[in-house]
Amino acid sequence: WQEDETPHAIQRFTTVDEMCRYELPAWRSTLWGKKVEWYHAMKEFVENMEVRLNGERIPVKVTLSINGDSPFMSAVELAGVNFYSWLLEAPDACREFLQRIADRYVEVETEYRRISGRPMRDGLNYSDDSAQVISLKQYREFCVPIARRLYDMFGCDRFDGRMMHLCGRNVHLHPALLHDLNITLLHGFGSANAPEEMHLLAGKVVLQGNIDPMTLYQ
């Protein structure tokens, strides 16, 4: 985190050995910790805010959740593109590292829900944005066990209870999303996935796409 720059991840290690020895920082010193500060500040701010739609006052709700993240995304941010080759070269080490990040994810999200008073099983907005480039087999091996654990802990059966954000081309992962993770909503995917390719999820999952960036460009 830099006060004068856009928040971004910095690669922390370049070898499998460094990954195995890497100690995750105390989360309250990270961006996840800052979210707690911002949550309390925003709660105070909205007390004096009035928003109206067609003259009718509407509530402004401040939420606190990890949202739109996953252990796989964090691993890629920490290791860089090396992590993709390590999935083949050192799969056990990768699984162990992902599990450590998942444990931290559970710790933080549980605390967030305690602070905000949100029920534990009130839905989860999950994202595996770094995983579109791996195969269905790899996704089932490395991502599904962790995502299933988190969905089962924080998700619910509501239409938005097991949300997945997966931009980029993700059609090859649809069998795992539907049959292994039982997602209820896929959102934020774009034109890399043609409408006729969404047949496996159509009618079973809420599909919420996005504007084709080329449309905006033109």
Feature locations, PLM:
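A contiguous, low-structure linker/loop signature
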Residues: 1-22
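Active-site loop segments of alpha/beta catalytic cores
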Residues: 4, 25-218
